[in-house]
């Protein structure tokens, strides 16, 4: 039953939010509180719970140790049980649809115009946008499944995951069952550039993040040269101070307007 309580944010454009590995939606909601505050008049944020059990991530235990249980989207090590790609994608989709349905019941009516993820969630966010791109190219726009205008990738690393391996798969892409690429990337696949996400993305990099070089690989090798970059003097976490958040807010609002997102007057 749909909520009937008046909500000034009900009709706002929606952003799908994907937490990091070894985290959960509650933690990601806390991590993004400053960003959401600045964007609260423009977007409604919908948080998804990862489908798979996980140990807490190394950057989670310091502040959110008691916020479990912890979840993940993909396998990140041999401690995570093997799963076939089809089942993994189905579980991810089920989690996303459940969050969307829950927000509809809570009164949300806006279009899903963007997807935002942190760390492993950023990999998934980019991969969902990539799937939309591939489906539109190979099956037609009506079959793309989503209509995200852009993605916000917080401290994300490649490679992209092919969520539809029957439509596109090469040595530069993972499938959803893998921990990492399991074979060398061929020069032929690199030159064909079928692994490149050309839809708009905003990348947020912490300059003190130990994984910074890997995040730059996602930006430079897997995304369009028109991708936007916001750098800040922080580690592997979401910016929380106003001075660090405002440059990202500016990029999000600017890109939203450029990609046709309509805000209420």
UniProtKB/Swiss-Prot annotation:
Induction (record text): Expression is positively regulated by the azaterrilone A cluster-specific transcription factor tazR.
Signal peptide: none
GO cellular component, one term: nucleus
Pathway membership: Secondary metabolite biosynthesis
Top-rank EC class of the record's enzyme: hydrolase
Source organism superkingdom: Eukaryota
Single GO MF descriptor: hydrolase activity
EC number per UniProt: 3.1.2.-
Keywords linked to the UniProt accession: Hydrolase
Residues annotated as catalytic: 119, 209, 236
Gene Ontology process terms (BP): secondary metabolite biosynthetic process
InterPro entries in the cross-refs: AB_hydrolase_fold (IPR029058), FSH-like_dom (IPR005645), LovG (IPR050593)
Pfam families recorded: FSH1
Record's function text: Probable esterase; part of the gene cluster that mediates the biosynthesis of azaterrilone A and other azaphilones, a class of fungal metabolites characterized by a highly oxygenated pyrano-quinone bicyclic core and exhibiting a broad range of bioactivities. The first step of the pathway begins with the non-reducing polyketide synthase tazA that assembles one acetyl-CoA starter unit, five malonyl-CoA units, and catalyzes a series of Claisen condensations, methylation, PT-mediated cyclization, and finally releases the first hexaketide precursor through the R-domain.
Similarity remark: Belongs to the LovG family.
PANTHER family: ESTERASE DBAE-RELATED, ESTERASE OVCA2
Protein name: Probable esterase tazC
Gene behind this protein: tazC
């Amino acid at each position: 039953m749909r909520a009937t309580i008046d909500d000034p944010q009900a009709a706002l454009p929606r952003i799908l939010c994907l937490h990091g590995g070894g985290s959960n939606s509650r933690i990601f909601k806390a991590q993004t509180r400053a960003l959401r505050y600045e964007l609260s008049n423009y977007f409604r944020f919908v948080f998804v719970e990862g489908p798979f059990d996980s140990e807490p991530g190394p950057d989670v235990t310091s502040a959110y140790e008691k916020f479990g249980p912890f979840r993940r989207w993909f396998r990140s090590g041999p401690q995570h049980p093997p799963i076939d790609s089809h089942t993994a994608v189905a579980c991810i989709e089920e989690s996303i649809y459940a969050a969307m349905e829950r927000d509809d019941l809570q009164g949300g009516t806006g279009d899903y115009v963007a997807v935002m993820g942190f760390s492993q969630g950023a990999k998934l966010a980019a991969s969902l946008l990539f799937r939309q791109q591939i489906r539109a190219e190979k099956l037609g726009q009506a079959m793309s499944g989503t209509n995200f205008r852009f993605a916000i990738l917080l401290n994300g690393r490649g490679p992209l995951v092919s969520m539809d391996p029957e439509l596109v798969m090469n040595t530069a892409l993972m499938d959803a069952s893998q921990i990492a690429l399991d074979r060398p990337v061929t020069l032929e696949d690199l030159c064909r550039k079928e692994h490149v996400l050309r839809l708009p993305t905003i990348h947020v990099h912490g300059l003190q993040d130990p994984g910074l070089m890997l995040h730059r690989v996602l930006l430079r090798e897997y995304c369009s040269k028109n991708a936007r970059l916001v750098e800040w003097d922080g580690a592997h976490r979401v910016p929380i101070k106003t001075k660090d958040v405002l440059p990202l807010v500016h990029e999000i609002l600017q890109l939203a307007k450029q990609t046709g997102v309509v805000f209420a007057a």
